[in-house]
Amino acid sequence: TFYMNPELFHEKRVIHYLGKNYPKSIPLFETFLDRSLKYKGVEKEIRDKLNFYKKIYFCNHHNAHIAISFFLSDFKEAAVISIDGAGEITSTVLAVVQDNKIEVLREVDFPDSLGMLYNSVTYYLGFNPISDQGKVMGLSAYGDYSEYIDKFRKIIKLNDDGTYRMDLDYFEFQNKRNTWISEKFLSTFGPRRSSDEEIEKKHKDIAAALQRRLEEIYFHMGAYLKEETNMKHLCLGGGVSLNSVANGKLLQKEYFEDIFIPPPTGDDGLSIGAPLYYNYCVLKNTERFPFVSPFLGPEYNDDEILKTIKRFHLRYQKSDNIFKETAVLLSENNIISWYQGRMEIGPRALGNRSI
């Protein structure tokens, strides 16, 4: 199985999107065409490198996100929200899963995209737009959203059907590669912060407003799904679902009794999601194997750890009561790196490799 449908990507991105937005889309033509050819070449690459000549199933991108978020849970049925930058063309899916069948209720297509919105503001704040969204989420806790929230409410608005739409005049990602924001965005929020500039109160407040607007859209989608499906449970998938702050606040709204989010909920989990979709939705197998633990990575014993410490000439001491000493250090506002047991899967710290 593979986590992208090459034919659908070519149809939606290269033919439909580029054609619909011509001539503005010309700068994206090479990028989208290269990606399309890469995806179309996946089958040959798999067969050549692995000597594999059986069937290869190409799973729609968001079906793979939905599959890992639902089929690893122990829910028999659930509402599902899948949000990322974009798959073949879709950026957000609101769905329900019953009897191992996925029913899509609503979709949002690129360039309207919560993922691209968050990426763009991450870039504006001086961080890597592809990998540093978590830093912006963390930064938001230090800011006050009140000054900028109305600006973000103008940038991304709510639709009555549980979806949203963006004012794309603030952005350039839909027209050019590696160009995220427009002059209108800069005239609204001021100059972009470079990565070596000090983070000021303004940057914290903008991060807080972005985070708040994301949460408002989360609540909007959650309320819609609850009303439409009356499900007790919700599953979250896609890279935006790594926003643990928004996830926690959505749970607190009590639209749903419980929420399941797989640790590798971004594209890193699609190698699990695609075969899960094929197993349950194509082959129609019914036996479920719920997710038991995120701690599936490597672990190292004391001898191995000590050997590494000595190799790098690090100072160390053995503690008689590591929990008490850690509590004291934390109470004194120290930063702790916590390392125990097997490493968790996924990009978020879940207790065994944490700061």
In which residue ranges do the predicted regions lie?
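Short acidic/glycine-rich loops and adjacent helix/strand connectors
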Residues: 1-355
